[in-house]
């Protein structure tokens, strides 16, 4: 019986003590270890299984952490974490107080650059390489590992374009598996496919034309071949590029056959690969599905409706429309800047454009939102999925900045629905005709109405622009909520001893604010509490404070929301507790709120 090798590897120095012929066994053990832990603790499975051999080869050939290794996005970095001093606490991955699901500089010296968003690795590694040269270190290696979906993003090309005119000691490794979270799209994907199939002559190679020493494509699961090629490239100075071909989910049959589902499958059987299905009976719908079903229903009736997503057709549920109306629903790849300006161009031609981008990823297209959309007052409909705290993906993925970064933009309307009905109704209302851009923000996960699809779906009501509503009367304190966090207020008031003293107002329109109802609130209540699931600085509460100051009101105002710090990973409920906006914290607050 073979002895266990992985349990004796604490860091890459231990890995390098092994004979090369032992590394295949390490790969088998590492792949199985990832499967066993992720099957119970959840996480990003497929990407990490696909680069097991590459991970081992990199840490075996290069002198990490002296040589600097940057993983793009980080979905594929579980093997890297396990081999770099975190095997024993890998079971805490993505849990509150545990290790991050992504490389993180403050966590470990082997994590040279914090990642989570796409296409940053080449620029980061190039920056490190140029810095090393300026410091007189000409031997240090700088490696960027990037996927075929990420390299199609504009920022990756910017990095390649710069690197190609330097003599920086950088190695870019393209992990080509033809899929990101969803299948890769675009002309570059077709080009890479032709290269893999041997149909593209080497003299036409796009990477060689950028002055990189190009090699490949080679089998990314052939450890001896990988090691041999990395050793060869290590001796070459200047920009180098290695194209490897891998299979996402390698080593688990179901993950290889259903790569989208097994990107992050939840809990599953480590032996059979079967996903432990959760019963969805009597559960509310996911907000993403409310969007997906509603836009498809509206698009069937209105030929001007267009849907756009940057590489998130499944996660946004725009896939419903893409499957039925493919000519009017577009996955543009990991290209948020392009997605926004594409939407703007369509809007100039009187199309009704729903641009669905995760809140955290719209940050990548901020200039386009201002310059190409708002400045021209084009009626683009931004649907910001994953707004608020998203949970285990942590600080890189929380959608907590959108209210603050959008509220300052002229012409921009911001709407945060309380529930599924408000979401479908605002999606309906905007296609009736608007003369300004609007951002509709809603969270990851499920709503609050189990019977929405049967009782409410398709029964549309027009929403009046800028109107807030009183959900509950009170005598002493007014609670003003923006968005789905208002459901925590509703639940807390059911259990608060002095609920009769507390009024609740739903401000779905964060911009423009309902000044009429605000004026009534400030004249009626001495104390006002605002609550949001975004940052407090510059958010909804700040807008209420600005109204108060400009109208010379002296009321006591308490702002609840996300504090001025980056919130780490954990369940949404755990993170809401940290920010004191969960139901229990609100019950405690309301119990003292009228004193």
What are these model-predicted stretches?
Residues 252-362, 368-378, 460, 480-483:
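Non-catalytic terminal/interface segments that mediate subunit docking, oligomerization
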Residues 1-83, 208, 217-223, 240-243:
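N-terminal amphipathic, basic-rich helices that act as targeting or association modules
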Residues 32-39, 100-115, 137-143, 319-333, ...:
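Glycine/charged-rich beta-loop-alpha catalytic/anionic-binding loops adjacent to active sites
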Residues 26, 45-166, 287, 305, ...:
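Cofactor-binding active-site loop characterized by glycine-rich and histidine/acidic residues
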Residues 270, 275-279, 391-393, 413, ...:
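Peripheral docking tails and interdomain loops at the edges
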Residues 42-51, 71-75, 103-124, 146-150, ...:
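Active-site nucleophile and cofactor-binding loops and adjacent substrate-binding regions
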Residues 111-269, 274-284, 288-293, 412-525:
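Glycine-rich ThDP/TPP pyrophosphate-binding loop and its adjacent helix/strand module
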Residues 89-99, 165-179, 374-386:
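A glycine-rich helix N-cap at a beta->alpha junction
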């Amino acid at each position: 019986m073979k002895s266990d090798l992985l349990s004796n590897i604490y860091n890459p120095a231990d890995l390098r003590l092994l004979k090369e012929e032992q590394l295949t066994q390490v790969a088998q053990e590492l792949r199985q270890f990832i499967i066993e832990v992720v099957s119970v603790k959840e996480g990003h499975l497929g990407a990490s299984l696909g680069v097991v051999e590459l991970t081992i080869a990199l840490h075996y050939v290069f002198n990490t952490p002296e040589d600097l290794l940057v993983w793009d996005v980080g979905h594929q970095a579980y093997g890297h974490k396990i081999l770099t001093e975190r095997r024993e606490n890998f079971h805490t991955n993505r849990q509150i107080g545990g290790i991050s699901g992504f490389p993180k500089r403050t966590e470990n010296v082997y994590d040279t650059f914090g990642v989570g968003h796409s296409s940053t690795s080449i620029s980061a590694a190039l920056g490190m390489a140029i810095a090393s040269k300026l410091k007189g270190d000409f031997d240090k290696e700088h490696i960027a590992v990037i996927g075929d979906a990420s390299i199609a993003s504009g920022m990756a090309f910017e990095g390649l374009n710069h690197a190609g005119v330097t003599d920086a000691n950088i190695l870019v490794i393209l992990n080509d598996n033809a899929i990101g979270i969803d299948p890769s799209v675009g002309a570059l994907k077709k080009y890479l496919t032709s290269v893999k199939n041997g149909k593209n002559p080497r003299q036409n190679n796009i990477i060689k034309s950028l002055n990189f020493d190009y090699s490949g494509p080679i089998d990314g699961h052939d450890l001896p071949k990988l090691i041999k090629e990395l050793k060869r490239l290590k001796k070459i100075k200047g920009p180098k590029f290695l194209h490897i071909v891998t299979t996402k989910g390698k080593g688990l049959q179901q993950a290889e056959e259903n790569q989208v589902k097994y990107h992050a499958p939840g809990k599953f059987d480590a032996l059979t690969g079967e996903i432990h299905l959760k019963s969805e009976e009597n559960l509310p719908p996911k907000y993403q599905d409310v969007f997906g079903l509603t836009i498809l229903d509206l698009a069937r009736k209105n030929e001007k409706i267009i849907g756009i997503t940057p590489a998130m057709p499944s996660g946004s549920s725009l896939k419903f429309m893409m499957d039925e109306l493919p000519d009017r629903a577009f996955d543009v790849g990991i290209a948020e800047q392009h997605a926004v300006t594409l939407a703007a161009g369509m809007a100039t031609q009187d199309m009704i454009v729903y641009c669905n981008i995760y809140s955290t990823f719209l940050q990548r297209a901020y200039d386009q939102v201002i310059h190409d959309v708002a400045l021209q007052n084009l009626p683009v409909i931004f649907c910001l999925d994953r707004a608020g705290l998203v949970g285990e993906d942590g600080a890189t993925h929380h959608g907590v900045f959108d209210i603050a970064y959008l509220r300052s933009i002229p012409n921009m309307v911001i709407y945060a629905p309380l529930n599924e009905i408000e979401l479908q109704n605002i999606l309906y209302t905007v296609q009736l005709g608007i003369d300004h851009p609007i951002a509709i923000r809603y969270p990851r996960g499920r709503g609050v109405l189990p019977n929405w699809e049967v009782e409410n779906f398709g029964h549309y009501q027009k929403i009046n622009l800028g109107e807030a509503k009183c959900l509950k009367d009170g005598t002493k304190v007014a609670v003003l909520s923006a968005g789905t966090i208002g459901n925590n207020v509703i639940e807390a008031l059911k259990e608060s001893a002095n609920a009769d003293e507390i009024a609740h107002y739903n401000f779905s329109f964060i911009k423009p604010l309902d000044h009429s109802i605000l004026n009534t609130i400030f004249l009626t209540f001495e104390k006002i509490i605002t609550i949001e699931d975004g940052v407090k600085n510059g958010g909804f509460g700040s807008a209420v404070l600005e109204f108060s100051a400009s109208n010379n009101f002296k009321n006591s105002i308490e702002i609840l929301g996300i504090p001025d710090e980056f919130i780490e990973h954990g369940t949404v409920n755990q993170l809401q507790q940290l920010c004191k906006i969960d139901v229990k914290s609100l019950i405690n607050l309301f119990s003292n709120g009228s004193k």
